[in-house]
From Swiss-Prot:
Cellular component terms per the entry's GO annotation: cytosolic large ribosomal subunit
Sorted UniProt keywords: Ribonucleoprotein, Ribosomal protein
Gene for this chain: rpmI
GO biological process terms, semicolon-separated: translation
Organism per entry: Buchnera aphidicola subsp. Cinara cedri (strain Cc)
InterPro entries, alphabetized: Ribosomal_bL35 (IPR001706), Ribosomal_bL35-like (IPR021137), Ribosomal_bL35_CS (IPR018265), Ribosomal_bL35_sf (IPR037229)
The protein's name in its UniProt record: Large ribosomal subunit protein bL35
């Protein structure tokens, strides 16, 4: 049986927490930032826990985490 490959783009985007869930960054913080509010941009810097519907897909991408 060959080894299962890890999807490298997913391994860079998701980090596993101690409880076994995955964290990810929020979107909309790359460009066109001058018209966005400072409070809004500060909230975008925080990490968010992945939803359970996406959790099953990420488990397929990252078999060894």
């Amino acid at each position: 049986m060959p080894k299962i490959k890890t999807l490298r783009s997913a391994s860079k985007r998701f980090k596993k927490t101690a409880s076994g869930l995955f964290k990810r960054k929020k979107a909309n913080l790359r460009h066109i930032l001058t018209k966005k509010n400072t409070n809004y941009k500060r909230c975008l810097r925080k990490k968010i826990i992945l939803s359970l519907s996406d959790y099953k897909k990420v488990l397929l991408f990252l078999p060894y985490l």
